């Protein structure tokens, strides 16, 4: 399969923007799953890592932007069905099921767990500022 064939087949894959899974966004702003199941601020790389964990073929497109908010750059294309119409992963048949699975995996992503550990220890420091009484 040459590059042209691959590119044309990727065009038929489903698109997942990080906004679809972002719990900080409203439905009007583009979230596609319930806020209780969504995760805060997912990235394209985290979504792609979750797709590879779920054994779903995917392609990251970092040069593409979300149409409603063009400051949010990046999207992931995923292949849910093979050419014959059968699902790639029998446990995941629809795009919504895939988005829910990814949203469950993103908070457990190794990049997030490493970021949160140092932040928790550094915020437990002393508080600065004047603590005197205010005059009436």
Swiss-Prot record:
Gene this protein is translated from: SRP19
Family according to the record: Belongs to the SRP19 family.
Pfam families, alphabetized: SRP19 (PF01922)
Protein name: Signal recognition particle 19 kDa protein
Subunit-level organization: Component of a signal recognition particle complex that consists of a 7SL RNA molecule of 300 nucleotides and six protein subunits: SRP72, SRP68, SRP54, SRP19, SRP14 and SRP9.
Functional note: Component of the signal recognition particle (SRP) complex, a ribonucleoprotein complex that mediates the cotranslational targeting of secretory and membrane proteins to the endoplasmic reticulum (ER). Binds directly to 7SL RNA. Mediates binding of SRP54 to the SRP complex.
InterPro entries: Signal_recog_particle_SRP19, SRP19-like_sf
Effect listed in the UniProt record for changing residue 32 to Q: Abolishes RNA binding
UniProt superkingdom: Eukaryota
GO cellular component: nucleolus; signal recognition particle, endoplasmic reticulum targeting
GO molecular function: 7S RNA binding
